Amino acid sequence: TNETENYMPVTLDLAQLIMRVLADIRKEGKQMTYLRPDSKSQVTVEYSEEGIPQRIDTIVVSTQHDEFDDDDERMLAKIKDDVLNILMPRVKAEIHSEKVLSLFGDDIKYFVNPTGKFVIGGPHGDTGLTGRKIIVDTYGGKGAHGGGAFSGKDPSKVDRSAAYAARHIAKNMVAAGVADEMLVQVSYAIGVAEPVNIYVNTYGRSRVQMSDAEIAQKISKLFDLRPKAIERTLKLRQPIYRETAAYGHMGRKNEIVEKTFTSRYHETKVMKLELFTWEKLDRVDDIKREFGL
């Protein structure tokens, strides 16, 4: 979707940003010094009937904290005040899109630690935790999800590699101007390399004079979606996944970094690695040519 500069749903993008800034404040140790690592956020946005974001309705922030005051009400009031006056101004300062900033009005409802004090967190507070949160790892509930978690799977599993490929396709298609919003769904049969189906939904926001089914046919012509080809194209057989452990797998920054690895035999290897290859806008020109844009 073109809601944000990184082609992500604005609801998830803002929730992830709130969490990153909150973590920065905690690690700096200068303000909100009571913060602990466990935290979560949710952003609710009002949309028009045409699917355009209109305003932020609600922001929820729950954060673990030290028990720094004997009076629970006073402690919770302090946390909420700091969220409003320390956290949120820093969050807004990180946003460079006027379109996104315009969603912040004076009537936003803030719920900060709405269940009360949050001193015990992590596995200590919740036994029987789920695996990686697959919706937060993708699009925050917008669109659809195949149901398989990413973390823990090697890239031969289409649960992971094809989800990255679908993201790569949808992002490049929207960036090329084919549609303002697009869902790309790829279906596979076990033991069959070629996808059995490619489904596209532009939610009525296509910019080209063709059906979603015709767009899907163009995608199958432009992109090789066999698992081995996806691995090769997106360089998925590299040690590039540590950064996906927090803040989601989609909408992240594509960059080249240098990493140092040490084996059990104390051998050191330095590698230059490209992170989040599925976020590259490297097929925009090909798409424009194919669609005559």
What are these regions (language model features)?
Residues 1, 41-66, 122-143, 186, ...:
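Short beta-strand elements
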Residues 1-120, 246, 251-255, 266-292:
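Glycine-rich, mobile lid/loop segments that gate access to catalytic sites or pores
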Residues 7, 88, 129-180:
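Conserved mixed alpha/beta catalytic, RNA-binding, or beta-rich assembly cores of soluble enzyme
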Residues 7-11, 15, 72, 76-80, ...:
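Short, charged, low-complexity patches
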Residues 12-23, 80-89, 133, 137, ...:
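Predominant activation on well-ordered alpha-helical scaffold segments within soluble catalytic domains
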Residues 24-30, 89-97, 153-157, 166, ...:
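Flexible helix-coil linker/hinge segments at domain or subdomain boundaries
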Residues 62-69, 107, 114-121, 126, ...:
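ATP-dependent carboxylate activation and anion-phosphoryl transfer catalytic cores
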Residues 181, 188-293:
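Internal helix-turn-beta structural module
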